[in-house]
């Protein structure tokens, strides 16, 4: 599904921006549930992202090529060592002696600037898949359909939620 969406974005860009050198990279945020890799008792959201990316300025991509990019990027980044390194980087910045004594309002402003430079704005869309949802048998007869809607971030306005229930996948 991620590859199909990336291909569609490339085709839209090709229509809207005929000059290849003016096209932008196509990057999708794919959330990864870290609870499956790292046991945690927290009830907070414990996730990171895998970010498959292609650059249309380098030429046209076939659907198979995009599928390979997504497949290999997922395999590379969705690894406990790689995710552990991302977590360690975040934790190390929190433990910095300078940042620990810095007033919160300054930290918040700095984090906003950093997030704007490297956060979700650097992607085209976020594709989040809850997977197959199972309901208790007593509840199932009362449910006709299951949907998953992602909140719209301030900078990256395109999101897609996917959920499967009762043999049907809703996008």
Show the residue positions of the predicted features:
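Short amphipathic alpha-helical segments
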Residues: 1-5
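Acyl-thioester-dependent acyl-group transfer interface
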Residues: 10-170
């Amino acid at each position: 599904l991620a590859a199909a969406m990336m291909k569609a974005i490339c085709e839209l860009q090709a229509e809207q921006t005929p000059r290849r050198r003016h096209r932008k990279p196509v990057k999708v945020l794919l959330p990864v549930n870290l609870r499956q890799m790292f046991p945690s008792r927290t009830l907070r959201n414990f996730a990171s992202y895998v970010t498959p990316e292609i650059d249309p300025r380098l030429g046209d991509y076939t659907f198979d090529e995009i599928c390979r990019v997504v497949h290999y990027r997922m395999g590379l980044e969705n690894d406990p060592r790689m995710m552990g390194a991302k977590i360690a980087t975040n934790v190390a910045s929190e433990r910095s002696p300078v940042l620990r004594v810095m007033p919160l309002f300054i930290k918040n402003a700095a984090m906003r600037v950093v997030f704007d430079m490297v956060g979700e704005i650097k992607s085209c869309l976020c594709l989040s898949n809850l997977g197959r949802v199972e309901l208790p048998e007593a509840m199932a007869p009362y449910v006709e359909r299951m949907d998953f809607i992602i909140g719209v971030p301030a900078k990256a306005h395109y999101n897609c939620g996917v959920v499967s229930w009762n043999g049907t996948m809703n996008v």
